[in-house]
Design a protein with these regions (language model features):
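A conserved regulatory-domain signal marking ACT and ACT-like small-molecule sensing domains
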Residues: 47-148
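A short, charged, Gly/Pro-tolerant segment at domain boundaries
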Residues: 18-19, 38-44, 142-146
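Conserved residues at beta->alpha junctions
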Residues: 15, 40-41, 72, 114
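Active-site-adjacent helical/loop segments in soluble small-molecule enzymes
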Residues: 1-34
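Catalytic phosphate/nucleotide-handling subdomain of diverse soluble enzymes
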Residues: 25-55
């Protein structure tokens, strides 16, 4: 909601100020056909926090997903991932890789932004079809905060 207000209406609000609008999604069936007023308040928000707010919003909406992926340590491994795993509108927004010596595979932390939440299942299916082993970080808050 905060991002929508900012992106579409150039309104900067603090998280508490957008709470009433966020609640509309949860109550949409109960308030259908009724007149509803939402009070949007507070611009007590540091604009430098917008990136953090955007990140949390994308995670909440199911549009951003983080993984630890074990990549083969050979030329073209990332290109293979991009070509055969990512959908046409998927985007790698975070990538951290460390080459390991004397090993066939090395771990990479990857952040992938999807255009629609329903694209997630297809992403996982393509990873499995390509034999890619991964750890999903969004459901593991301790590891997520440590790595991302």
């Amino acid at each position: 909601t905060i991002l929508q207000l900012y992106n579409f209406d150039a309104i900067v609000v603090e998280p508490a100020g957008a709470l009433s609008m966020s609640a509309l999604d949860d109550y949409k069936d109960k308030i259908k056909g009724k007149n509803v007023v939402c009070i949007v308040s507070g611009s007590n928000n540091d604009i430098t926090r917008m990136e953090e707010i955007k990140e949390r919003s994308l995670l909440y909406e199911g549009l951003k997903h983080y993984f630890i992926v074990r990549f083969p340590q050979r030329a073209g491994a990332l290109q293979n991932f991009v070509s055969n795993v990512l959908g046409p509108h998927d985007d790698i927004t975070y990538f951290e890789y460390r080459k390991k010596t004397q090993r066939e595979k090395g771990p990479a932390v990857i952040g992938i932004e999807l255009q629609h939440p329903e694209d997630f299942k297809g992403l996982l299916t393509r990873m499995e079809e390509q034999g890619i082993k991964y750890i999903y970080l969004n459901d593991n808050p301790n590891l997520f905060e440590f790595l991302v």
